[in-house]
Amino acid sequence: MTRALVLSGGGPVGIAWEAGLLAGLAEAGVELGEADFILGTSAGSFVGSQLAMGRRPADMAAAILAEAERVSAAVAAGSRPNGGERPPNLAGLFALMQEARSGERDPKEVRKEIGKFALEAKTMDEESFIKSFGRQLSGPQAEGWPERGYACTAVDAETGEFMLWTAESKVGLARAVASSCSVPGVYPPITINGRRYIDGGMRSGSNADLATGHELVVVVGLRTAGDAATSERMRAPLEKEMEVLRAGGARTELILPDDASVEAFGLNLMDGRRRPAACKAGMAQGRALAAELRRVWN
């Protein structure tokens, strides 16, 4: 049986929750990182790249949990974590993303509009952004590509064209992942082969429909607090992507954050102070899901 794992976007907080979820599952003997194919979008591209390179979920989670000590130290010293900066307000961006995903307007044209906004925004420079990923995306491995099946997504900032980075793309892993994580207005578009690329989540939060051709596809999605109508509107595109997978003969399993995880996220997935709590919640959810998921994955 061929197995695929799809990891969705969700900012720094989403990275923490996904790492915790995977660690909790692995602790109970369910190794989603052993998938034949891993597809990552935005936050999921980073987590997926680590899995594809053989990094243990437990190690990812441990590094995130250690951040709690730094946050506590900053508060005790009377300073604010994250350099005193408030997490960015992305309400306008999210509204455009919803337009692109809902079909209200031509998705490619909306993505071009988002790309224009990203290209004009004042952000850190590209190299500083890539370096911010730390040693996990540095050195020789960052210039190559995982031997295991791995792909991540991006969008051309000028044309709105969607891009799927794979081993055949002949692109360095660090730049591919950075482009997938380039949240418009927050991080810089990334230059690859003379083009500028932004977050693959501008097409879809998960791009799960691209994982066709596998018998079992586990999709790890994200959701945040909101009323029922908002939640349904955000989930509808994902359900359509799952239908594409099932129409291709795949069995699908969808994992979404439980209520405890959503509470741990807070209101802004870009708020790095929430990462340790999100990771802990993910670990607890992973442990709780393990018995059920083991029956289909193992």
Each model region followed by its residue ranges:
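Patatin-like phospholipase
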Residues: 1-41, 46-298
